[in-house]
Amino acid sequence: MEHVVTCWRLKLLSWPVFLIWICLSLASVSLISWDQLPAFLIPSTGDSSLQTAKSRDSMKAPGRLLLLTLCILTFSAVCVFLCCWACLPLCLATCLDRHLPAAPRSTVPGPLHFSGYSSVPDGKPLIRELCHSCAVVSNSGQMLGSGLGAQIDGAECVLRMNQAPTVGFEEDVGQRTTLRVISHTSVPLLLRNYSHYFQHARDTLYVVWGQGRHMDRVLGGRTYRTLLQLTRMYPGLQVYTFTERMMAYCDQIFQDETGKNRRQSGSFLSTGWFTMIPALELCEEIVVYGMVSDSYCSEKSPRSVPYHYFEKGRLDECQMYRLHEQAPRSAHRFITEKAVFSRWAKKRPIVFAHPSWRAK
């Protein structure tokens, strides 16, 4: 549902503004033309006082012309202002490289600069080559028993989320990790077993998303200080954060696709959302493993699996999705996000595997 807010404003404003402008213009031309008529063209009624009054009015024509011209100019300025207001979301989205999900990046030899990701601690942008094939591995319990580990590891780049482990699950989820996208709230979970996640993962790129004071670089937010300590503990560790501009871009995409402002609708974007965005930038072809469709949980007998493959016995996946989708505020919109991913799959080479389903 692209440009929903923008289109609504434009439709609301365009026709009334246009009609009012036309009416004012016609009225102005009519009044000015009548005032400028030569005296011999004024209908004679035999009433000299009427003709005298008309003559006096004709002397006021230049003043009326000036007044009407000023009115038209003022109204035109208001029109321009209202149109700019209506187009503001579209302009903002364009400035933030709005068309990323719909159009693939051009493939050029050599590394590319990705300015939406800032390294810790020097703040430099991410520089790397595109991945020809990517495996995006969901944390879903759908992965249990899949036996897809070797296929996942066969992709050029493997993307994982938060603290999802590989040890003990290699047969189903593989063991390679090229990029791990982490929520700022999940950083402490990785620190519980930091040697597993960081000590032997020098080839892994860590990208942390989050907003607010905890991620503040200037003031040294708590999460950012933790990331700094990690880079000191493990020299050469590749840690990046989403820039504020990139975070705003992700919010804007959500609004463009759903017609809802993320904050006003009480929504929190999931790590899955923040994983698909860089995947669209970094990958030429994407296979998403373990992600169900937006209609899966509304089917008669959906398969019951744990929300996370590494947390057995916890809340059922579909129960978690429904709980968040129906919550009035402070919730992830998992089902809504999956509907968006389905639309993206119509424009980009994205395939969903285990369960396998086609974009609608």
UniProtKB/Swiss-Prot annotation:
Q: Which residues lie on this side of the membrane: Cytoplasmic?
A: 1-71
Q: In which tissues is it expressed?
A: High expression in brain and colon and to a lesser extent in lung, heart, kidney, spleen and thymus.
Please list the disulfide bridges.
134-283
Tell me yes or no: is Coiled coil among this UniProt entry's keywords.
no
Which molecular function terms from Gene Ontology are attached?
Answer: alpha-N-acetylneuraminyl-2,3-beta-galactosyl-1,3-N-acetyl-galactosaminide 6-alpha-sialyltransferase activity
Keywords from the UniProt entry = Disulfide bond, Glycoprotein, Glycosyltransferase, Golgi apparatus, Lipid metabolism, Membrane, Sialic acid, Signal-anchor, Transferase, Transmembrane, Transmembrane helix
Q: Which domain of life is it from?
A: Eukaryota
* Protein name in the entry: Alpha-N-acetyl-neuraminyl-2,3-beta-galactosyl-1,3-N-acetyl-galactosaminide alpha-2,6-sialyltransferase
Q: Which organism does this sequence originate in?
A: Mus musculus (Mouse)
Q: Which gene encodes it?
A: St6galnac4
